[in-house]
Amino acid sequence: MEQQLTLVLLDSPKGAKYVETFEEAASSSSSSSSSSVPSCTDHRHRTFVKFFLYFSLVALAYYFIISSLAVSPIPPTLPQSSPGNVSSAKCDLFTGDWIPDPTGPLYTNVTCRHIQDFQNCLLNGRPDVNYLFWRWKPRDCDLPRFSPSQFLASVKNKWWAFIGDSIARNHVQSLICILSQVEEVEEIYHDKEFRSKIWRFPSHNFTLSVIWSPFLLKSETSSNSDIQLYLDQLDHKWTVQYPKFDYVVISGGKWFLKTTIFHENNVVTGCHYCQGRNNLTDLGYDYSYRKTLNLLRDFVLNSTHKPLVLFRTTTPDHFENGEWNTGGYCNRTMPFKEGQANMKTVDDVMRDVELEVFQKFGKGFGLGSNIRLLDTTGMSLLRPDGHPGPYRHPNPFAGVKNKSNVQNDCLHWCLPGPIDSWNDVMVETTLNRERELYDLTG
């Protein structure tokens, strides 16, 4: 019996593949019969040796098979409570630690063709790979690893949508990379800018969308004017499609920090970061963000269509000694421990607004509600090592005398990378809601 497991770790910029191969082999051979007649003692001795070798080989084969399962992405069963552990339905999935995980990611930059160049850190020459070998572990329960085969089986004939900015796109690309290890996806639509897309997994009739809507609201912009933001109108681009969706992951983000002019009831009411132009009052980004999330929440709760809506919380960046346009960088290679990282003020403010709006009626809006909070902020804060940094482009330091002149990306995530764990908590949050509904209906 021979079994071989090949794990492709990465593709170097020069195209060289690094491969670790594990081989398991167990073989047995029939012993040839002797022409001489053995003595009774010899016979018993040979019989004992045969049995010893036989059971040793069986035990060895069993050990190797079990070992191979430990590094293979075998779909986990639905999580069960274990002695001394809290079931995930009662567990805070978002308070925990990053622990070493020698199994590594479910895909690589070689096995997934859907990684955007800016997030393809290994192909762009990032020299370290330690950031790939961690997984998120909640404090009080076990979190099953994402199973692409189980996920696809559960979403047959369903439609998932991700709505937001480039971080939403980053997230959906992570999900597609994982799922494409089971079934390759077909892109069936994209807009002119390739920002909004629709994919389909044909054998499961599963549809997956990403909708570019960085403000979630109606907005207008041109090259020579500030962004006009309508605080009382959601973006028609996603609301007209909303009745099609069975599951929605929606999020705000750093776009609210841009210079924006606020409109309410067809009247300009203020602005953010407008530096007093036109004598407008600077109401701040928290004002527009709060208005947006309240409008979003009311739309979801009042709609007759009831998909499961996961609101994903803000994503902190990890720029140090500057921002993206002032020489900021991120060169850490290990996760933070609890207490080592502090949220920046802008992220703190956005998170406070999110919790104010989405925890107003209690955790999860109460049993049976179709809104859940996908609170990835804390787990993301602990991963300064997971960003492209300078490796948003191939070989970023080639021919550069001053490395500080190389722009870093410390907001988006490498693929594969920490963002893959968002899918673990996303699926478990979805399952917990299904369990709640089952308990309510009996």
From Swiss-Prot:
GO molecular function: O-acetyltransferase activity
Keywords from the UniProt entry: Membrane, Signal-anchor, Transmembrane, Transmembrane helix
GO cellular component terms attached to this protein's record: membrane
Entry membrane topology: Single-pass type II membrane protein
Coiled-coil residue windows: none
UniProt motif DCXHWCLPGXXDXWN motif: location: 409-423
Segments traversing the membrane: 51-71
Localization: Membrane
Miscellaneous section: Contains 2 motifs that are conserved in esterases, but it is unlikely that this protein belongs to the catalytically active pectin esterases.
Biological function: May be involved in the O-acetylation of mannan. May act as a bridging protein that binds pectin and other cell wall polysaccharides. Probably involved in maintaining esterification of pectins.
Record-stated family: Belongs to the PC-esterase family. TBL subfamily.
Protein name listed in UniProt: Protein trichome birefringence-like 26
Taxonomic source organism: Arabidopsis thaliana
